[in-house]
């Protein structure tokens, strides 16, 4: 597990995000923090991140805690997390249907996502790591230090 946590720390440090004036947009980091909060609290127990209000509420709460401004919609980082190697969508129909939802670079609306995405899920190893307090804490520290320390 030690080698794998290093891989996921590196993946978190290298999230595909917008950078302006040397600052990384924190949207994906806040979403991951929210997912880890849900795992810690027992809202997520089966590696299924659903398109529902619980993740939305957690994202908005964490955004206000760490960024202290009006939060954007959670569905933008939820959609764009598909660029990360550890984040996956479980399709209602086919993965090709998900790929056809929007043009490259665009964000699918919540309605479109709900028609094609049953839920998102993490690599099993990553999910196992964040279920453990020590692993979750290490990954949270990476996100908070890299994305939120200058706020």
Question: How should these model regions be labeled?
Answer:
Residues 1-151:
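Intrinsically disordered, charged low-complexity linkers and terminal tails
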């Amino acid at each position: 597990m030690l080698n794998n946590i290093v891989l996921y720390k590196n993946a978190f440090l290298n999230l595909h995000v917008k950078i302006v004036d040397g600052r990384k947009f924190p949207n994906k980091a806040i979403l991951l923090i929210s997912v880890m909060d849900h795992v810690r609290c027992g809202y997520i127990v089966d590696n299924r991140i659903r398109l529902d209000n619980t993740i939305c509420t957690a994202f908005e709460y964490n955004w206000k805690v760490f960024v202290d401004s009006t939060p954007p919609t959670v569905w933008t980082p939820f959609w764009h997390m598909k660029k990360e190697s550890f984040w996956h969508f479980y399709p209602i129909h086919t993965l090709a249907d998900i790929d056809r939802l929007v043009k490259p670079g665009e964000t699918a609306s919540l309605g479109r996502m709900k028609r094609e995405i049953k839920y998102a899920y993490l690599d099993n190893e990553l999910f196992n790591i964040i279920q453990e307090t020590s692993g979750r804490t290490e990954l949270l520290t990476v996100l908070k230090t890299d994305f939120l320390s200058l706020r």
